[in-house]
Swiss-Prot record:
Belongs to the RuBisCO large chain family. Type I subfamily. This is Ribulose bisphosphate carboxylase large chain. The disulfide bond which can form in the large chain dimeric partners within the hexadecamer appears to be associated with oxidative stress and protein turnover. Its main location: plastid. The basic functional RuBisCO is composed of a large chain homodimer in a 'head-to-tail' conformation. In form I RuBisCO this homodimer is arranged in a barrel-like tetramer with the small subunits forming a tetrameric 'cap' on each end of the 'barrel'. The lineage of its organism: Eukaryota, Viridiplantae, Streptophyta, Embryophyta, Tracheophyta. The modification N6-carboxylysine is found at residue 191. Binds 1 Mg(2+) ion per subunit.
Amino acid sequence: VGFKAGVKDYKLTYYTPDYETKDTDILAAFRVTPQPGVPPEEAGAAVAAESSTGTWTTVWTDGLTSLDRYKGRCYHIEPVAGEENQYIAYVAYPLDLFEEGSVTNMFTSIVGNVFGFKALRALRLEDLRIPPAYSKTFQGPPHGIQVERDKLNKYGRPLLGCTIKPKLGLSAKNYGRAVYECLRGGLDFTKDDENVNSQPFMRWRDRFLFCAEALYKAQAETGEIKGHYLNATAGTCEEMIKRAVFARELGVPIVMHDYLTGGFTANTSLAHYCRDNGLLLHIHRAMHAVIDRQKNHGMHFRVLAKALRLSGGDHIHAGTVVGKLEGERDITLGFVDLLRDDFIEKDRSRGIYFTQDWVSLPGVIPVASGGIHVWHMPALTEIFGDDSVLQFGGGTLGHPWGNAPGAVANRVALEACVKARNEGRDLAREGNEIIREASKWSPELAAACEVWKEIKFEFPAMDTL
């Protein structure tokens, strides 16, 4: 028969508006900004083609396979309200296009080449629907929310953390001292900063030893289980696992990884190691804003959050809504639910484009961190609820009397907010009053209230629908 060589419009093959999506399809919602003169159907079809089976011209080898079985399909396009020349293109991918249990492969396919495509001015992946048929091929988080609570024996309240500052420059012994004071004062966790790996002023092994010592001393004195996120992120996967092994040998409860800079392959390996060896895994999202901050290009953080739940992590940073970093309330709560819950309904007002069913994959605890202090505590308790980690770096270490009193202030504020909430008080309305009352019987909290009474980070949010 021969085949018809030449270049033909993508939309003839890849735009299929009458396609019925299958339960096993991976669905993607892209925000497409076509170049002038490119019709939206062609742009949407081009995205489907270039992220699945297509190439720029008809090829003879197409005849050796069944394109109908394997091609991505753009099945719906809608204009974005209030934006000129922007469309949401919905693409369905057959499950067979993806390697099982590999976030790396999923992203290489869906967001690999297509983002440099000339016919598009910009392209953003807004959401993915991961079908159970695919999510069940992943281990997911090493432990999940309930197992973590049981390991730590902490229930009915958010957990408290603190990133040790100055993030770079402390010796291991001084670093360990800062860890001890924070944990002794009443925090549940302290944290290595994301860029603390193994630098000349503090090699990883020394830090691990001094932090473990700090942890056990604080545990003995408070009778509570304590943790310090030991950052295992390293230049090679082998070195990363070596650090995790040493953490396990020290008997500490939790390690940490920078999952975007470290990469999904490394992260998934570490998550498997953590489940096999009883370590919790804290995930930092360093580099996320490079990918997710532009409104019209890149990937929304909710996609990176879903990818992390597949790859594996027990905590992940998720913005604060109130501090110094990005995060609009409804949108943030949208992906917080995607991290914690088993079943999340489609809700476009929160940026959730698809109903997501995680079946039995464990949940991830969202971490609120960045520019928050005691006055934010009522809002954070209300917004994030019990299954969260509230992390105050400067908001602990910046206390005028030092780290331990800073930790005391945060713990007192948190306990006051939880108690008030359980008594039925309205944290949003009475928050300041609740903190003021509590500070009457806690000099540490009173001092903290005084220092940060006027601090706000007020800028318009970038992350809008």
